[in-house]
Curated annotation (Swiss-Prot):
Signal peptide: none
Protein topology in the membrane: Multi-pass membrane protein
Gene Ontology terms: biological process: proton motive force-driven plasma membrane ATP synthesis
Assembly and binders: F-type ATPases have 2 components, CF(1) - the catalytic core - and CF(0) - the membrane proton channel. CF(1) has five subunits: alpha(3), beta(3), gamma(1), delta(1), epsilon(1). CF(0) has three main subunits: a(1), b(2) and c(9-12). The alpha and beta chains form an alternating ring which encloses part of the gamma chain. CF(1) is attached to CF(0) by a central stalk formed by the gamma and epsilon chains, while a peripheral stalk is formed by the delta and b chains.
Keywords noted in UniProt: ATP synthesis, Cell inner membrane, Cell membrane, CF(0), Hydrogen ion transport, Ion transport, Membrane, Transmembrane, Transmembrane helix, Transport
Entry's transmembrane regions: 25-45, 86-106, 111-131, 142-162, 181-201, 202-222
Purpose of the protein: Key component of the proton channel; it plays a direct role in the translocation of protons across the membrane.
MF terms (GO), sorted A to Z: proton-transporting ATP synthase activity, rotational mechanism
Family the UniProt entry places it in: Belongs to the ATPase A chain family.
HAMAP family associated with the record: ATP_synth_a_bact
Gene Ontology CC entries for this record: plasma membrane; proton-transporting ATP synthase complex
Record has Translocase as a keyword: no
Name by which UniProt lists this protein: ATP synthase subunit a
Length: 229
């Protein structure tokens, strides 16, 4: 849902030659804004590293350390190489969700193109990791444990794997877009009484959706690392 007042209106004009819709242009604009924001925060946090962290370094160490602990608890030590990917996706989704709570800003995750792009990254990473780890034996993940059921299981597994990016993208898009719609309705009905509780609910929804997306990404990659039986 597009806010009545947008912060980066000029992007619509900039992207007009590409015939991109207004909602798509807004999503692109705010996606780049979030990328720049995360880069600036990372540069500030790592500019002058200290043995005893303070300020932004301390905050980012807590955030990144929390994500790292979750990766280790879910995937074990073999999940460490995939921590940068999972942490980047988690932070991007979280900030994308939260930015919609600022008046005049649009959450890119309320646009299906953005959520689909993130889901495709997870989908491709899962199978690239699986092929890199197991080689051609990775195909055994799709065959099932009983050889004479392999053709049927292969078909079922293919459908299951193709449904993963669909469910990942639609879940995040549906929740964030639905929240935007509900927020707009309540703002129209009671602009002075409802905003605060709705904003608090928005923060909760933003964190939950980022957590669910990160958790599913870890589970999918973890599954591709396991030996097929």
């Amino acid at each position: 849902m597009v806010h009545p007042l947008l912060f980066l209106q000029f992007f619509r004009k900039l992207l007009e030659p590409l015939h991109i819709s207004e909602a798509g242009a807004d999503a692109i604009a705010y996606t780049w804004l979030i990328i720049v924001f995360l880069l600036i925060v990372s540069l500030i946090a790592t500019k002058a590293l200290k043995a005893v962290p303070t300020g932004m370094q301390n905050f980012m160490e807590v955030v990144v350390g929390g994500i790292e602990n979750m990766v280790e608890e879910t995937m074990g030590e073999k999940g460490r190489p995939y921590f940068p990917l999972i942490a980047t996706l988690a932070l991007f989704v979280l900030v994308s969700n939260l930015i919609g709570l600022i008046p005049g800003f649009f959450p890119p995750t309320a646009n299906l193109n953005t959520t689909a792009a993130c889901a495709i990254i997870v989908f491709l990473s899962t199978h690239v990791v699986g092929i890199k780890k197991h080689g051609f034996h990775y195909l055994q993940h799709f065959m099932g444990p009983i050889w004479w059921l392999a053709p049927l299981m292969f078909f079922i597994e293919i459908i299951g794997h193709l449904s993963r990016p669909l469910s990942l993208s639609l879940r995040l898009f549906g929740n964030m877009n639905g929240h935007e719609l509900v927020l707009m309705i309540f703002f129209a009905l009671a602009p002075f009484l409802v905003p605060l509780p709705m904003m608090l609910m928005g923060v909760l929804v933003s964190f939950i959706q980022a957590f669910v997306f990160m958790l599913l990404a870890m589970i999918y990659i973890q599954g591709s690392l396991e030996e097929a039986h």
